[in-house]
C-alpha cells in the first residue's frame, strides 16, 4: 500500500523556485497549521472553555462567538511573520496592512458557521489568496478570477482541508496521530447533474420568482420537468454543504430575498463566495448569483454580501436560465404549490 502524500509534500512539488508560488506555499502551510490548532479547540469543546456564547457583534452586525475570536487570533499569529502584504478577516472592520511590498494578500473567515458550535454541527475556516497589486490596499478589489489559491477546512467527524492552487481540487485529511494533513482525494470532479438541493425552505415566501420556480420544480420530482426525484439537504453550515457537493454533487442556494438586510443574501463575497466559487469551478461545477458568475464580480466593499448558487454545473445553469428566460412563469403552475396543490400560496 502506498503512503499518502502529505500537504507539505504536495506544496513543495507545486511551488518550485517561483517567489510568488513560494509565498503561496508558505501561507497555505501556515493556514493548515492554524487549522490543526483550531481543530483541537473544536474537538475539545467545553473542555477547552468553548461555550459558544456570544462575545458581542462584529463590525458587520453578526453575533461573534468566543471561538470566532480565538480562531481569528490563531490565524493571525500563524500568518503574521510571512511575506504577506494584507490580511482581511471577516471578524475585523478594516484591512490589516502588514508588508505592502509582499507578493500575496490573504482573506479569511476564521470560523464559518460558529452558530453551530453549541449543537455540535460542523464548522470551518475559509481562505482566499490574492496577488498583491501595486496599491496593496486594493488587494481585495480584484475579481475572484484573480485568486492564486483558495481553500476551506471542515471541522467535522474528520478534519478535512480542501484546496485549490488553480489546477484542480484536492482533499487532505488530518492525521491526528502525526498531526499532518494527508492527501485523500485528488483532482475532485463534481457530477455535472445531481438530485440534491440545499436551501432554507422556510424562507420560500421571501424568494424571487426564479428561485421559487426552481425549487418548486425540484419538489415536483419525477412528475415535473426534470423527470427526477430530488432530496433536500440543509445543514446550515457552508463548509459542510460545499464538502458534500464536492464528493457527490448537488446544488446549494443562499439567494437574496425580500427581507430587510437580505436583498443580497448574507454570504460575504471576499471571505466566502469568491473562495468557494474558485474551488467549485476548479472541480467542474458552477457558481453564480443567478445572473452573474461569482468569479467575475469585483468587490465594491470589503464586507460586501452576495447571493450564492453553487454546485453541479447543469443544476446551476438551469437556475440561471430561470433568472434570464421565460421559465419563471412555470412557478405559478407548479402542482405542489398551485391552487389544487398541497401548499396554497
Curated annotation (Swiss-Prot):
Chain positions recorded as Mg(2+) 1 binding sites: 90, 109, 111
Cofactor: Mg(2+)
Any one cellular-component term (Gene Ontology): cytosol
MF terms in GO: fructose 1,6-bisphosphate 1-phosphatase activity; magnesium ion binding
Keywords of the record: Carbohydrate metabolism, Cytoplasm, Hydrolase, Magnesium, Metal-binding
Pathway: Carbohydrate biosynthesis; gluconeogenesis
Binding sites annotated in the UniProt record for substrate: 112-115, 200
Example of a GO biological process term: gluconeogenesis
Binding site for Mg(2+) 2: 109, 112, 272
Cofactor, free-text remark: Binds 2 magnesium ions per subunit.
Catalysed reactions, semicolon-separated: beta-D-fructose 1,6-bisphosphate + H2O = beta-D-fructose 6-phosphate + phosphate
Location(s), subcellular: Cytoplasm
Top-tier EC class: hydrolase
Pfam families assigned to the protein according to its UniProt record, in alphabetical order: FBPase, FBPase_C
Quaternary data: Homotetramer.
Family: Belongs to the FBPase class 1 family.
Protein name as annotated: Fructose-1,6-bisphosphatase class 1 1
Organism: Nitrobacter hamburgensis (strain DSM 10229 / NCIMB 13809 / X14)
Organism lineage: Bacteria, Pseudomonadati, Pseudomonadota, Alphaproteobacteria, Hyphomicrobiales
Amino acid at each position: 500500500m502506498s503512503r499518502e502524500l502529505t500537504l507539505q509534500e504536495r506544496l513543495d512539488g507545486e511551488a518550485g523556485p517561483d517567489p510568488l508560488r513560494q509565498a503561496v506555499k508558505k501561507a497555505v502551510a501556515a493556514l493548515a497549521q492554524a487549522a490543526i490548532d483550531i481543530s483541537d479547540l473544536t474537538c475539545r469543546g467545553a473542555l477547552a472553555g468553548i461555550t459558544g456564547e456570544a462575545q458581542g457583534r462584529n463590525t458587520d452586525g453578526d453575533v461573534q462567538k468566543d471561538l470566532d475570536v480565538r480562531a481569528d487570533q490563531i490565524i493571525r499569529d500563524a500568518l503574521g511573520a510571512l511575506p504577506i502584504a494584507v490580511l482581511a478577516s471577516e471578524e475585523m472592520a478594516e484591512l490589516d496592512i502588514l508588508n505592502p511590498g509582499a507578493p500575496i494578500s490573504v482573506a479569511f473567515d476564521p470560523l464559518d458557521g460558529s452558530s453551530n458550535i453549541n449543537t455540535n454541527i460542523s464548522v470551518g475556516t475559509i481562505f482566499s489568496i490574492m496577488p498583491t497589486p501595486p496599491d496593496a490596499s486594493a488587494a481585495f478589489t480584484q475579481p475572484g478570477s484573480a485568486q492564486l489559491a483558495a481553500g476551506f477546512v471542515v471541522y467535522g467527524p474528520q478534519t478535512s482541508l480542501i484546496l485549490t492552487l488553480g489546477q484542480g481540487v484536492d482533499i487532505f485529511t488530518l492525521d491526528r496521530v502525526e498531526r499532518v494533513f494527508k492527501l485523500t482525494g485528488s483532482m475532485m470532479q463534481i457530477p455535472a447533474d445531481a438530485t440534491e438541493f440545499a436551501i432554507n425552505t422556510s424562507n420560500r415566501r421571501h424568494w424571487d420568482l426564479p428561485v421559487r420556480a426552481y425549487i418548486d420544480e425540484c419538489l415536483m420530482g419525477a412528475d415535473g420537468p426534470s423527470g427526477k426525484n430530488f432530496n433536500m439537504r440543509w445543514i446550515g453550515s457552508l463548509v459542510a454543504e460545499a464538502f458534500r457537493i464536492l464528493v457527490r454533487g448537488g446544488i446549494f442556494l443562499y439567494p437574496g430575498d425580500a427581507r430587510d438586510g437580505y436583498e443580497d443574501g448574507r454570504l460575504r463575497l471576499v471571505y466566502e463566495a469568491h473562495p468557494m466559487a474558485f474551488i467549485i469551478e476548479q472541480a467542474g461545477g458552477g457558481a453564480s448569483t443567478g445572473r452573474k458568475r461569482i468569479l467575475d464580480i469585483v468587490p465594491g466593499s470589503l464586507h460586501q454580501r452576495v447571493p450564492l448558487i453553487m454546485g453541479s454545473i447543469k443544476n446551476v445553469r438551469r437556475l440561471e436560465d430561470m433568472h434570464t428566460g421565460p421559465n419563471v412563469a412555470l412557478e405559478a403552475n407548479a402542482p405542489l404549490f398551485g391552487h389544487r396543490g398541497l401548499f396554497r400560496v
